[in-house]
Amino acid sequence: DRPQLLTRTFDRNYLVKYLGIDTFTVYDGLKTAKNNQARSNADSSDLNKVISYTQKNYAQPNPSMFGIAKNKNIIVIHLESFQQFLINYKLNGKSVTPFLNSLYNGKETYSFSNFFNQVGQGKTSDAETMLETGAFGLPQGSLFSALGTDNTFEAAPAILNQQSGYSSAVFHGNSGSFWNRDNVYKNFGYQNFFDASYYDTDSENLTEYGV
C-alpha cells in the first residue's frame, strides 16, 4: 500500500517494515555514499549562477506592506490537497469552509492569487520546504528524506528566532518520522514539534488525516 518506497522515501520505518532491515541497510549505505560524493564534488563557484540570477531578478519589498506585521504572532495553517474553489463555496446551502471564509473575507486579509503548485515527488514535504526556505524540492525523491538530516537551512523559524527572538512550534497529526520531519524540523530551527504521539488519536477524534 506504499508505492515508490525507494524513490520518494516517505519514511525510513516503512522501508524496514516492507522491505526488511537488510534491504534498508544496503539502500541507506548507497544513498549515504551518493550524498558524500556529491558534497566532495561540489564547488562554491556552482553558486555563482544562482547569485547572479537572484541579483538580476531581485524584487524590492512593497514599502506600503513591508514590516506591517512586525512583532506579531505568526500562525501558518498548512492544508493538505486544498484548492481555492472551496473558499466561499456552499453545498446544500451550507458553507464548506466557514472558518476559512471568515479569514479570507476579513477586512485585514491580504489574498494572493499568483500562487501555484510547485511540488515534485516530495509532495507535502516539498511544499513545506518552499514555505519555510523558498527552495524547490529535488528532481527525484524528497529533500526532507534525502538531505534534511545532515543539513541546516536558512529557514523562517531559525531566521525569526535569530533576528527577532521568536519561539516556534509545529503541530502535525502524523508520525514524526514520516517525511523525516522529526529531524528536518530541528534543522529548520523549530524549537518544538508535536506529532501524533501528543494527541488522543481514537476514532472519535480522527477523520482520514485530520485530528
Q: What residue ranges belong to the model's regions?
A:
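Catalytic-adjacent loop/helix segments of enzymes that bind and process anionic phosphate/sulfate esters
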Residues: 46-55, 138-211
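His/Cys-centered metal/cofactor-coordination and adjacent catalytic loops
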Residues: 62, 69-70, 83-159, 202
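N-terminal secretory/membrane-targeting segments
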Residues: 1-72, 86-97, 101-105, 150, ...
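Catalytic glutamate of the conserved HExxH
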Residues: 73, 77, 81
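Residue-level detector of short, conserved catalytic/binding motifs and their immediate flanks
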Residues: 72-73, 169
